[in-house]
């Protein structure tokens, strides 16, 4: 990486890490975040942390957090750190600084960088896998394909999100190697398969010893395959929250459409190539998974979809005024959404007993000063007893 590029990468990563760390939740978290705090800090049952399935254990995340963290805030800072790396990785893919800043300020990424979750770490893998894919498509060098396969294999150890883009990667590699000769094709796919298997060795071991269902979906098969009945109130709430992350892509797509309608557009050098087709395919795969995954926290699964949406409009260059306007919109819209959701007569968005205001908690990405989970656990059952057991089989009795 050239010195100038690495300097900008580090400045962007450090800047957003500072933002996320300052606005992150200091104490215990709710729901899955509280479960991560409990498992990482209190459970010593191997990398699975006592989970009832490999699919929900996220062993790579657990291993990193356990080796570095001794307090709930430190566990949350893992999300902040990888959220910042994801922003910097997006910039490496797009080379559009203004849009990278807008992406870093988007609702879902900021929100998930302030709580204990695995999704920002997963997004960092997505960013660098995309970078390696684009480098391979541009150069046709085998090293980039092998690096992509190895990185995706390690990603599988973190989250099954990594399996979604595999068909796109395989088709892109096959199309790029078409006509290269049987020997080169065999070597390319053989080395890539070996690299992927090396990266995913623990996942493959779990697959062999625990079975396909345990590794892929665990007890969440109905949700993963979209077989459960939909709660349209919750779905509407999640779509509204997810929409807060697409301000910049929609604005830039509208601007590009207007510009294209008013004058003939000049051909973009890389737009017609395979990279553009791959980005669209990756967007479609992740968007399809997201829209039919009806769970209470559905909006937290929107990050890869938002990443590719931002990347596809990254070629639209922004002046300083428009960049500042987009940043202001990203900052103000959560406040507007909070007020709107709080004013609607929907029980799911009203304050949750005396501890948590649902509209505020989900609409505002920053979590500094939010000690609602600490107060709930301490008042009801003690600092840790209000959280799930190591197996994660039951939510908190009084603080679900």
Predicted regions and their residues:
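Transmembrane-helix motifs of polytopic, lipid-linked glycan transferases
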Residues: 10, 77-97, 128-132, 311-312
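Signature aromatic-anchored transmembrane alpha helix within multi-pass, membrane-resident enzymes
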Residues: 10, 97-101, 190, 194, ...
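Extracytoplasmic catalytic/substrate-binding loops of multi-pass membrane glycan-assembly enzymes
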Residues: 23-38, 48-64, 73
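Short acidic/glycine- and proline-prone juxtamembrane loop motifs at membrane-interface regions
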Residues: 31, 111-119
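Transmembrane alpha-helices of multi-pass, membrane-embedded glycan-processing enzymes
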Residues: 57, 61, 65-69, 75-89, ...
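Membrane-interface alpha helices of multi-pass inner-membrane proteins
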Residues: 100-101, 144-159
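Transmembrane-lumen/periplasm boundary regions of multi-pass, lipid-linked membrane glycan transferases
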Residues: 119, 170-174, 185-261
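Hydrophobic/aromatic-rich transmembrane helices and adjacent perimembrane loops
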Residues: 164, 292-318
């Amino acid at each position: 990486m050239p010195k100038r590029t690495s300097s900008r990468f580090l400045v962007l990563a450090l800047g957003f890490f500072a933002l996320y760390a300052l606005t992150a939740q200091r104490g215990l978290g709710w729901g899955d975040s509280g479960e991560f705090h409990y498992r990482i800090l209190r459970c010593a049952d191997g990398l699975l942390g006592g989970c009832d399935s490999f699919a929900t254990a996220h062993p790579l995340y657990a291993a990193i957090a356990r080796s570095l963290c001794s307090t709930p805030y430190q566990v949350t800072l893992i999300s902040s750190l990888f959220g910042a790396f994801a922003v910097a990785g997006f910039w490496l893919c797009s080379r559009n600084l203004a849009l990278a800043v807008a992406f870093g300020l988007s609702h879902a990424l900021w929100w998930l960088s302030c709580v204990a979750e695995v999704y920002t770490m997963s997004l960092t893998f997505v960013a660098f896998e995309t970078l390696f894919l684009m480098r391979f498509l541009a150069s046709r060098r085998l090293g980039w394909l092998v690096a992509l396969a190895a990185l995706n294999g390690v990603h599988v150890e973190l989250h099954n999100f990594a399996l979604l883009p595999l068909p796109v990667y395989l088709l892109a590699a096959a199309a790029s190697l078409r006509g290269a000769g049987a020997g080169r094709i065999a070597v390319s796919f053989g080395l890539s398969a070996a690299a992927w298997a090396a990266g995913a060795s623990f996942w493959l071991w779990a697959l062999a010893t625990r079975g396909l269902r345990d590794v892929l979906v665990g007890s969440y098969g109905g949700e993963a395959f979209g077989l459960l009945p939909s709660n349209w109130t919750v779905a509407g709430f999640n779509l509204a929250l997810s929409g807060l992350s697409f301000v910049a892509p929609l604005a830039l797509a509208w601007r590009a459409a207007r510009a294209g309608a008013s004058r003939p557009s000049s051909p973009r050098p890389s737009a017609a190539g395979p990279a553009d087709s791959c980005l669209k395919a990756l967007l479609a795969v992740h968007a399809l998974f997201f829209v039919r995954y009806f769970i209470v926290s559905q909006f937290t699964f929107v990050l890869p979809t938002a990443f590719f949406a931002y990347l596809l409009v990254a070629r639209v260059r922004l002046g300083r005024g428009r960049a500042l306007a987009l940043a202001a919109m990203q900052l103000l819209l959560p406040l507007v959404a909070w007020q709107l959701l709080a004013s609607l007569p929907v029980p799911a968005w009203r304050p949750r007993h005396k501890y948590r205001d649902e509209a505020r908690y989900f609409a505002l990405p920053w979590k500094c000063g939010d000690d609602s989970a600490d107060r709930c656990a301490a008042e009801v059952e003690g600092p840790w007893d209000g959280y799930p057991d190591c197996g994660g089989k039951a939510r908190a009795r009084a603080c679900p």
